[in-house]
Regions:
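Non-catalytic, topology-defining segments of multipass membrane proteins
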Residues: 1-59, 90-185, 244-297
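Long helical/loop segments within the catalytic core of UDP-sugar-dependent glycosyltransferases
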Residues: 58, 219-230
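Histidine-centered catalytic micro-motifs
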Residues: 63-73, 100-113, 199-205, 226-242
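Membrane-helix boundary/juxtamembrane motif in polytopic membrane proteins
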Residues: 154, 183-185, 207-217
């Protein structure tokens, strides 16, 4: 009887964001601590550059998952604190939280639609080694589609003012090289990782619109820790309110349902032409789209 219920949908206990000091809160404050320590280590304690750089990469990697959960209101049950987590993570990454949220929700509404899925261009608009640069398209998409609500334009302006102020002060007081090498370059590294594991690998070959087939899972306990659950990306698309640390148990709870729906449950990069297609995307990645696409159901 229990398995029959699981074949219908995900169990309810996975759906709601918990309150308290949950993993997203822990990751957020860990990221803040890492950035603070690396900054003090560089300027005050003569830490080696590679330690400061690595600490900032890890901090931004953690922030990338927190902002993602916050955009779905699944970082924390308290909406105000969820927004704080989202805005704080966005500032660490150099993002604007309302842009990330509205554009990301458009991705969920139009997965693999060349015209309306903003992440489709991020994944397929050129070589993978330039995927981080294509995240700037999100800002263009945000304004072109006029996606803002209520005070989100003000929030965008303040976010951009924050970054601009740091850059101006860095130029004025001679620490721009630190900003470039220990903030922007780590953000570039994390941007490549986000583009690869949040956008490219889960949705390739970018053709399916069916909700059960427009993303994939590739189960792995190790990857679940390293890329913070994004190897269960289909689970996230089917039930976006699940926090990242519940993707793996939610996957195993719903695996009979995913099997019945013939969902893609492997990475498939080494299968036949997929490997050569991946190499093409790494170095060139240009695609030509027809006007017809597979409909969702």
């Amino acid at each position: 009887m229990q398995s029959a219920e699981m074949l219908l949908t995900v169990p309810k206990e996975y759906l709601k964001a918990p309150g308290g000091f949950n993993p997203n809160v822990t990751m957020f404050f860990s990221a803040l601590s890492l950035i603070t320590l690396s900054t003090c280590g560089y300027w005050l304690w003569s830490w080696p550059d590679w330690i400061c750089f690595s600490a900032n990469v890890l901090a931004l990697h953690l922030s990338g998952t927190v902002i993602h959960d916050a955009s779905h209101n699944s970082a924390h049950s308290n909406r105000t604190f969820n927004a704080i987590l989202g805005h704080g993570s966005a500032l660490m990454l150099g993002f604007a939280f309302p842009v990330f949220t509205r554009v990301h929700l458009q991705h969920h509404a139009h997965v693999n639609d060349p015209e309306n899925d903003p992440d489709h261009f991020v994944s397929t608009g050129g070589p993978l080694w330039m995927i981080a640069a294509r995240f700037f398209y999100h800002e263009i998409f945000f304004f072109k589609r006029q996606l803002w609500r209520k005070y989100e334009l003000l929030e965008w302006f303040l976010s951009r003012l924050f970054v601009a102020t740091i850059v101006i002060f860095a130029c004025q007081y001679g620490f721009i090289s630190y900003v470039m090498n220990f903030w922007f370059v780590p953000a570039l590294v994390v941007g490549i990782a986000l583009g690869l594991f949040f956008d490219y690998l889960p949705h390739r070959p970018f053709q399916e619109r069916n909700r059960w087939k427009n993303a994939r899972v590739y189960p792995s306990t190790l990857l679940n820790l390293l890329i913070l659950g994004q190897n269960y990306h289909l689970v996230h698309h089917l039930w976006p309110s699940i926090p990242w640390y519940k993707y793996q148990p939610a996957y195993y709870a719903t695996k009979p349902l995913l099997d019945a729906k013939d969902c893609e449950q492997s990475l498939g990069l080494l299968q036949g032409k997929n490997f050569w297609s991946f190499l093409y995307d790494v170095f060139l990645g240009i695609r030509f789209h027809s006007h017809s696409s597979k409909s969702s159901s």
